[in-house]
């Protein structure tokens, strides 16, 4: 097995175990197993692992391996935003589960739960995975990967917006609150979305300055996240 594939498998196992640990914590906070929104969210995470193993690992093992590496040239602003994202995600899930257990929001219509499920599924299992399949340079923190001949990607979802992976993650965070039935969880969910918008703006700015061909690509694909809006 090539070293990159071995490293990619380790990364995928780590991510999958982390997701399973998160799922266990969710049900632990809620305090019961007969909670279908929790199982629906679990299915979204499990499906992501399956799709990553089936469609990303065979074509981009080096990209997955790269996501596990720490580089000295990682930007401090990016690491700070990643930390804020982690805190917001932890608050979002904890608040949602406490809300379900203690009944702060109260029952929501089934359509609200299903709408949240659709947003989370489209964002995480479709748009994010599609972005990773298309972009061999889709790594966890911003850096120009000169050692891998980093180049502009303009196919797939990148033909419509310049940062489709961030759009997918924003949809996931906004959808989770509705799926789990917690309006209180929308507060950290919107904070996570705001952090991703800031990260998009900063990353887009440095890509213009540092990645050859990106300015020409940005002139062709005008929208950073949402066509017709921004």
Model-found features: residue ranges?
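Membrane-anchoring alpha-helices and their flanking helix-loop junctions
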Residues: 1-158, 167-230
């Amino acid at each position: 097995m090539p070293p990159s594939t071995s490293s990619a498998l380790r990364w995928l196992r780590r991510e999958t175990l982390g997701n399973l640990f998160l799922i266990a914590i969710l049900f632990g906070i809620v305090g019961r197993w007969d909670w279908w929104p929790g199982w629906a969210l679990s299915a979204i995470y499990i499906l992501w692992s399956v799709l990553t193993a089936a469609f990303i690992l065979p074509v981009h093992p080096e990209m997955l391996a790269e996501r596990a590496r720490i580089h000295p040239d990682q930007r401090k602003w990016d690491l700070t935003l990643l930390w804020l994202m982690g805190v917001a995600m932890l608050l979002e899930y904890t608040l949602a589960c406490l809300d379900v257990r203690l009944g702060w929001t109260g029952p929501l219509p089934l359509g609200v739960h299903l709408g949240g499920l659709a947003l989370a599924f489209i964002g995480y299992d479709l748009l994010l995975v599609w972005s990773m399949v298309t972009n061999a340079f889709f790594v966890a923190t911003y850096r120009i990967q000169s050692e891998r001949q980093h180049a502009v990607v303009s196919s797939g979802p990148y033909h419509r917006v310049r940062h489709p992976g961030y759009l997918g993650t924003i949809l996931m965070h906004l959808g989770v609150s509705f799926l789990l039935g917690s309006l209180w969880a929308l507060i950290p969910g919107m904070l996570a979305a705001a952090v991703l918008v800031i990260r998009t703006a900063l990353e887009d700015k440095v890509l213009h300055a540092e990645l050859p061909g990106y300015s020409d690509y940005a002139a062709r694909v005008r929208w950073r996240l949402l066509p017709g809006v921004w």
